Amino acid sequence: MTANQTRADGAIIAAATGLALVLMLHHPTSLSTTHDDGQFLSDWSNGFVHAAMIGCLLALAIGLDGVKRQLDETRILTRTGALLLGAGLLALAGAALVNGFATGRLLASTSDPAVREAGGHTLWALNQSLDALGTVLVALGAATWSPGLWRRSFAGRVAAALGVVILGLALWHTTTDGGFGLQMAVAAMAAFALWSLAVAATMILARPDGEAE
């Protein structure tokens, strides 16, 4: 990989992460029971926001593919981490698809309260499951890449440490059956954003020859 390609991948990761953080403002930002309280982007289409979030996940996958090549894709840990990250991002995209499109289509397709309630509960459970699965898989992938990132640079060591922390938090929350509500979604997004930005910095500041420090 050339230095420009490496920096471009880092820039893609940083941009996708930043946009995803902005899109999270579509959700309530307080614990008030008022539905619209704190929804800075409440006037944005739910479908548009979730479609854009899926686009961010796709952009992250593209940028992280460059990280895989930078970390030496012949290594088993690199390949395993890439597979876990890809599967995790796919699960998160599925969760966004359910929340952004499937739920709305269900409500529009019937006026039967019983069908709406049963379908809503089913889709909510599916969304929660995909979110939890995606979070754990991404955390596993980030931690699996930690040894390779640690060898890169100071930014790489920060990313490596964050990867281990994210995995610990994800496993703790999963084993305690805390559910995947808004607070957990925001916390998971913030933790993954820090890791992504550290990885982006590792790529942008990488040596032209691609060798570790």
Regions found by a protein language model. Give the residues of each.
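Hydrophobic, aromatic-enriched alpha-helical segments typical of multi-pass transmembrane helices
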Residues: 1-213
